Amino acid sequence: MKHLAMLFSVLALFAMPVQAFDAGTKKALPTTTVAELPKEGRDTLALIRKGGPFPYAAKDGSSFSNRERTLPKQPRGYYKEYTVKTPGSRDRGARRIVCGGKEQRECYYTADHYKTFKLIQE
């Protein structure tokens, strides 16, 4: 019985919601789900999971420096950025997904060119 209680305690830790904090303000970043992303955002996230190919190969997958300090502080090179196509835009537009970590599993969506981010919960 003691082991069962311990197992449930450990499982409860994994069920807790993930939060990310703005490195500059220390406020929790808002979250979004994959389903709430625009279609183009879901498409970009699928390409990230597949490893490409990306429509903006020269820029997609490049290092995101987090100069604005809106994402949690991490070592240089931790974050990579990817373009989320904007219908009707002649350039890359303002929408991006920024992912971090070795397997690029910690991802954030911005619709306003890095001013604000939402943690994507999968």
Place the predicted regions along the sequence by residue.
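Positively charged n-region of N-terminal signal peptides that target proteins for export
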Residues: 1-4
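Functional cores of ribonucleases/endoribonucleases
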Residues: 53-122
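Hydrophobic helical h-region of N-terminal Sec-dependent signal peptides
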Residues: 6-10
